[in-house]
């Protein structure tokens, strides 16, 4: 199980590297502080929903997007579940479950590349969703999506321009 302190440290480290994003992540940070103080969650389903996901970039600068019914395609992410000690491990497991068998972390990019905030899906209630995203690399030929699978390669610039700029910067410099 990913310890609450691991998530708190991840958010803290991320906001120190990107102070301009601190106001957006403040509700999550406040909730984590309240949980630590109380020793548990007493918010009855109103806490920010935290998910984790890989931003899998191939040699063509494309990422696999997941389509789901009528909903628009989006970057893969999943709720935190039992069995993982780190957020990175959970992101890698999701990538492998999608058919990305051979993947590696871009050198210098061991920390999340993005903490993406959005409104949670309707079935999750009226609350914030925070996707902890890790940059991982692969080659398209090493991915084995099942026939009819919901994954589709999409140019990163069509997904999220800010994320594309951040990925370009990381890949060019290896800097945090």
Question: What is the role of each PLM region?
Answer:
Residues 13-53:
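Acidic, metal-coordinating catalytic segment for phosphate/diphosphate chemistry
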Residues 36-40, 51, 87, 116-121:
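Short acidic (Asp/Glu) patches
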Residues 133-174:
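NUDIX/MutT-family hydrolases
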């Amino acid at each position: 199980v990913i310890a609450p302190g691991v998530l708190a440290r991840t958010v803290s480290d991320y906001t120190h590297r990107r102070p301009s994003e601190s106001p957006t992540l403040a509700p999550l940070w406040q909730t984590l502080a309240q949980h630590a103080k109380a020793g548990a969650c007493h918010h009855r389903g109103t806490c920010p929903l935290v998910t984790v996901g890989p931003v899998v970039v191939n040699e063509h600068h494309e990422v696999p997007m997941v389509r789901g019914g009528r909903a628009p395609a989006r970057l893969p992410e999943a709720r935190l579940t039992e069995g993982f000690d780190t957020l990175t491990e959970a992101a890698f497991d999701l990538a492998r479950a999608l058919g990305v068998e051979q993947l590696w972390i871009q050198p210098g990019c061991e920390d999340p590349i993005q903490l993406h905030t959005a409104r949670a899906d309707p079935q999750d209630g009226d609350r914030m969703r925070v996707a902890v995203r890790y940059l991982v690399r692969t080659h398209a030929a090493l991915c084995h999506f099942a026939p009819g699978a919901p994954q589709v390669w999409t140019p990163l610039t069509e997904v999220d321009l800010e994320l594309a700029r951040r990925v370009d910067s990381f890949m060019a410099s290896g800097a945090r």
